[in-house]
């Protein structure tokens, strides 16, 4: 969504070649990250999440690794035409996610890859579609805290399973209630803070304000539980990304 909005604001089609390429490169990164996560967590999943692809027999460990390599190949192949900066920023985001999968997911520093990878995402997209970086200069400062909140919300969903295997991720160190409260509070603070800044600064857009409000309501209802918070944050991520692009265009 961000790439398409930035492209139209530059006077280009919403689905221009750069937008399609950057979308495919991000998709490749997601495939790499997801497949590598399944491979790295196969032992854990066999104990507590047997519906995951490897323990369920849907794919073997080698197949998961092959899929991860394929995702990386897709990311690189579609990033090269976008230029060196987009290629390197995208690889940095994927490298950060890889450190989570292979090393940091069970440590108190489990939030760091989320902070880095998601903060790099708007820069990756903007450089890919050729938008001026000043357009999204403040975005990483806002995306980062939201990403940490998303990490906490996600790990609270798996709190019992992680506790069963002795995971030491940040949510486990903080405790279920504290981690959930921080996740909800940080996400709400980001939404309220950004919305207030736009209104006070006069950078308002009717559709953007509506999307911002929808995202805030989606997060607010998440106070009812971890699953609802996670779903609400997914909705907010889409709404707030579009709202940001419209308000700063």
How should these model regions be labeled?
Residues 38-45, 107-115, 131-137, 156-163, ...:
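A cytosolic-side transmembrane-helix exit/cap motif
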Residues 52-132, 221-224:
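Intramembrane alpha-helical segments
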Residues 22-24, 42-90, 167-204:
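Multi-pass membrane catalytic core of lipid/isoprenoid biosynthesis enzymes
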Residues 20, 24, 28, 67-77, ...:
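Lipid-exposed faces of alpha-helical membrane segments in multi-pass integral membrane proteins
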Residues 199, 203-249:
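Extended hydrophobic alpha-helices typical of membrane-associated regions
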Residues 1-6, 112-130, 171-176, 231-248:
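Small-residue-rich segments of transmembrane alpha-helices in multi-pass membrane proteins
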Residues 5-17, 114-159, 163, 176-188:
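Functional transmembrane core segments of multi-pass inner-membrane proteins
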Residues 2-40, 75-76, 80, 84-98, ...:
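Membrane-embedded alpha-helical segments that form the functional core of polytopic membrane enzymes
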